[in-house]
Regions:
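Residues on the lipid-exposed face of transmembrane beta-strands in outer-membrane beta-barrel proteins
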Residues: 56-62, 113-117, 130, 179-183, ...
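Transmembrane beta-strand segments that form the barrel wall of outer-membrane beta-barrel proteins
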Residues: 191-200, 240
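Short glycine-rich loop/turn motifs
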Residues: 110, 174-180, 188-190
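Transmembrane beta-barrel architecture of outer membranes
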Residues: 176, 210-214
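Short glycine/threonine-rich loop-to-helix capping motif typified by GTGT followed
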Residues: 205-209
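Surface-exposed loop/interface segments of Gram-negative outer-membrane beta-barrel transport/assembly proteins
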Residues: 1-53, 73-175, 202-204, 221-288, ...
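Transmembrane beta-barrel domains of bacterial outer-membrane proteins
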Residues: 65-67, 73
Length: 325
């Protein structure tokens, strides 16, 4: 607001004249809603937020022997966020005043179980990991918007004649199974293979299970030429991976919002989105390929990294607005 004032305008005058003696807004520029007195915004309007966050993580590991262990990890988080926005009576943008109070609550937990086995055979080292994971999130929101302020001295919901309540909630859960095998030979060759299976609650029943694998390897060729006064370290690496992802909640059906209007004896409502839901929605898949080389010279004083990376995505999930025709 101050940026739009002339350079010779005394800004102290705005500070001394932002409010009448009865507490209403001092109209200094003919009700311009875009240039409200900034001191009115600072001292009369109110905006507060509060966030409370609690989380906990626990883990239990049991080793059967030096090669095999089981591990259970669980964690949860609870986030509560409250917001209050007050626009006083007589404010040019909202002459009758407005008070909005919102609360948001997000609860989530994540539980994972893995079994890991490591061993060696001659010059080979290998490891196998199997596991499962459950991720759940529960989100709720509640907003009260009060308008038409009748008691101008008291900032409370009871001071307003008109009130609108908006509530929302959604849940989501992903159940996963995964496995990984890693191999190495003589500290020269390394390979990793993974496979993951996810089942999501936000996809259609016939498409809510999806798999995505990955494979990677590396070759430490500098081990073959040790000692070398020039090349301290050299590694060739390559990997291919596929990652699957699901959709946001409520993308499979039309959602309706009720209004305070009636048609005869019937309540009215409207569709809350301009997108037609896809009943055959599929998980999106992203394929990535990477190859590169890492080099270090002169006792690791100089390093060079070269990487080629390519990524392609299929069945991307996005909203496309419906034509008005």
């Amino acid at each position: 607001n101050l940026m739009n004032l002339a350079g010779n305008f005394d800004q102290v005058w705005l500070k001394d004249n932002y409010m009448h003696s009865d507490g209403t807004y001092y109209d200094w520029n003919r009700g311009d809603v875009w240039n409200i007195n900034p001191y009115w915004v600072q001292y009369a309007m109110k905006n507060t937020t509060q966030k409370d966050q609690y989380f906990a993580v626990a883990s239990f590991k049991y080793s059967v022997n030096k090669n095999l262990y089981f591990k259970l990890t669980g964690g949860g988080e609870n986030v509560n966020f409250s917001f209050m926005d007050y626009i006083p009576y007589s404010t040019p943008s909202t002459l009758l005043g407005q008070l909005q109070k919102s609360t948001f609550e997000n609860k989530s937990y994540n539980v994972e179980f893995i079994a890991n086995y490591q061993n060696s055979f001659k010059r080979f080292n290998y490891g196998i990991t199997l596991g499962g994971n459950v991720y759940h999130v529960d989100n709720k929101s509640h907003t009260i918007t009060a308008k038409n302020m009748s008691m101008h001295e008291t900032v409370a919901l009871q001071s307003f004649l008109q009130k609108e309540i908006t509530e929302g909630s959604w849940r989501k859960e992903i159940n996963s199974l995964f496995g990984m095998v890693n191999l190495s030979w003589k500290d020269l060759l390394y390979a990793d293979v993974t496979l993951r299976r996810d089942q999501s609650s936000t996809l259609p029943v016939n498409n809510n299970v999806y798999f995505y694998p990955s494979v990677g390897g590396s070759f430490l060729f500098s081990e073959l030429i040790k000692p070398n006064p020039i090349l301290s370290f050299g590694k060739l690496r390559a990997s291919w991976a596929q990652v699957g992802s699901d959709a946001d909640p409520f993308m499979l059906d039309l959602n309706y919002i009720m209004t305070d209007k009636t048609f005869g004896n019937y309540s009215t409502g409207y569709i809350s989105t301009g997108t037609i839901p896809n009943k055959d929605l599929k998980p999106s898949k992203t394929n990535s390929f990477e190859i590169g080389v890492d080099l270090k010279f002169l006792n690791n004083r100089i390093g060079l990294d070269f990487t080629y990376y390519k990524q392609n995505s299929n069945n991307q999930i996005m909203n496309v607005a419906t034509s008005v025709t």
